[in-house]
From Swiss-Prot:
It comes from Gallus gallus (Chicken). This is Hemoglobin subunit rho. PROSITE patterns: GLOBIN. Keywords: Heme, Iron, Metal-binding, Oxygen transport, Transport. The keyword S-adenosyl-L-methionine does not apply. CDD domains: Hb-beta-like.
Length: 147
């Protein structure tokens, strides 16, 4: 179990309270698909992913990005129980979807970039360190069923 100090929890919740889940989720997933194009193979039913413009404008990318970031919000609500929060999602991604668990880490790092771009004033190095810890814990929880 991961320990979160009161300051860490406050930094997480203060940034999260400002996040537009639809906008940031769409941007994070689009960036993942553009920067790491091999991740597109998990989204072959999304239609046109042939260029950055196509990916950014793809409504299925937007919708799934919102879904992913909404799910990430569950970690924010359950900081002391992240592993159990993602148990079913880990099983789904491992046993049914066969997603490489490294992709969770990549998406977490992309989320850090998106948050830093959107909240430049609030996203101090200390805040970044806390969010890096959070995305690492979430990635580990999502990869749990792979072990």
């Amino acid at each position: 179990m991961v320990h979160w100090s009161a300051e860490e929890k406050q930094l997480i919740t203060s940034v999260w309270s400002k996040v537009n889940v639809e906008e940031c989720g769409a941007e994070a997933l689009a960036r993942l698909l553009i920067v790491y194009p091999w991740t597109q193979r998990f989204f072959d039913n999304f239609g046109n992913l042939s260029s950055p413009t196509a990916i950014i404008g793809n409504p299925k990318v937007r919708a799934h990005g919102k879904k992913v970031l909404s799910s990430f919000g569950e970690a924010v609500k359950n900081l002391d129980n992240i592993k159990n929060t993602y148990a079913k999602l880990s099983e789904l991604h491992c046993e049914k979807l066969h997603v490489d668990p490294e992709n969770f880490r990549l998406l977490g790092n992309i989320l850090i970039i998106v948050l830093a771009a959107h909240f430049t004033k609030d996203f101090t190095p200390t805040c970044q360190a806390v969010w890096q810890k959070l995305v690492s814990v979430v990635a580990h929880a999502l990869a749990y069923k792979y072990h």
